[in-house]
Amino acid sequence: AVKADAESLPFDKDFFDAITCIDSWNYFGRDKAFLDNKISPFIKKGGKIYLAITGMEKEFNGEYPECLLLSWNKEQLEYIKDIEYWRDVLSSSKDFELLECRRMETDDEAWNDWLKEENEYAIGDRKSMESGAGDYLCFIMAVLEKK
């Protein structure tokens, strides 16, 4: 595992055959230029990117259900987008082809596993999830291939 700033990765060009990013792309990958400018140089031609992104069932435009606000503030919720948003951002890449972008079939299992964790973030998420936030949240998976 590598811990590094996604804005300035410490690798040679064409270093990776594939990268996987779980539950963090929504923090830095919302800029349409990010994928091509910051990630593309490190992926070999034909290389893959596999993403698992916390998502919303639909966009709320700042008017969030109360159950979501039990664990997250509006600023945090602005980072959680729906599938259409991610399709638009990811398919705008000039360097990558979006092969797949959809809701994960193991969505409920992923949330249940997360909520069993005893770290402060999982514990903090429980209040919202126990109050119905799972009706609004999902996990989105995406696969891209470098052209």
Regions picked out by a protein language model, each given a short descriptive name:
Residues 7-19:
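A short acidic, Gly/Pro-enriched loop at the edge of an enzyme's catalytic core
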Residues 32-48:
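A short glycine-rich, Lys/Arg-flanked "PGG" loop and its adjoining helix->strand segment in the class I
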Residues 22, 52-53:
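Alpha/beta-hydrolase-fold catalytic nucleophile elbow
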